[in-house]
């Protein structure tokens, strides 16, 4: 029995040290050395302080900011610990009700906007955490944001164009706008009706 138990226990402890301690430390060290920003969470800094991550969306509800995709992570929007397959099936009546409710909320926030609502403003991404919207979704919101902030519409549209990321190598992915980065750039603008 000792002849069988001893090698099994030695192997157990050796593999535990290798896979539970040595390997994670080596991978973490390599990540910190080779990709320090990504290893730290791909943080977006403002005045040296983290304001978010480039990988996870945030819940903007103020009409003076651009809004991201709906989060499907339950009562706490953009909760990374609740991420997962989140969209309802296309035949589920609850999906239709949710989309109608989101369209109504968008129309109420900008009653003069008769344009079709872009689909990414009313449906959640697969993870429910997507930080990007389409350029069409940003353009749809531009008039509301300009009006609330007292900015010229053309200035807001220029900002959207400036913050639009193109497909990688010109062919992989879609054009997209990072909502947090767009809102930070928007916050840096001075409204026309601002004092001083």
UniProtKB/Swiss-Prot annotation:
What are the entry keywords? ATP-binding, Cell inner membrane, Cell membrane, Ion transport, Membrane, Nucleotide-binding, Potassium, Potassium transport, Transmembrane, Transmembrane helix, Transport
Q: Would you say which domain of life the source belongs to? A: Bacteria
Annotated membrane topology is: Single-pass membrane protein
Q: Which GO molecular function, any one, fits this protein according to its record? A: ATP binding
> Is Hydrolase among this UniProt entry's keywords?
no
InterPro entries linked: KdpC
The transmembrane segments are 7-27
Q: Which cellular compartments is it found in?
A: Cell inner membrane
Gene Ontology CC: one annotated term: plasma membrane
Principal subcellular localization:
membrane
Q: What do we know about how this protein assembles, alone or with others?
A: The system is composed of three essential subunits: KdpA, KdpB and KdpC.
PANTHER family given in the database record: POTASSIUM-TRANSPORTING ATPASE C CHAIN, POTASSIUM-TRANSPORTING ATPASE KDPC SUBUNIT
According to its UniProt record, which protein family does this protein belong to? Answer: Belongs to the KdpC family.
Q: State what this protein does.
A: Part of the high-affinity ATP-driven potassium transport (or Kdp) system, which catalyzes the hydrolysis of ATP coupled with the electrogenic transport of potassium into the cytoplasm. This subunit acts as a catalytic chaperone that increases the ATP-binding affinity of the ATP-hydrolyzing subunit KdpB by the formation of a transient KdpB/KdpC/ATP ternary complex.
Know the name of this protein?
A: Potassium-transporting ATPase KdpC subunit
Q: Which gene encodes it?
A: kdpC
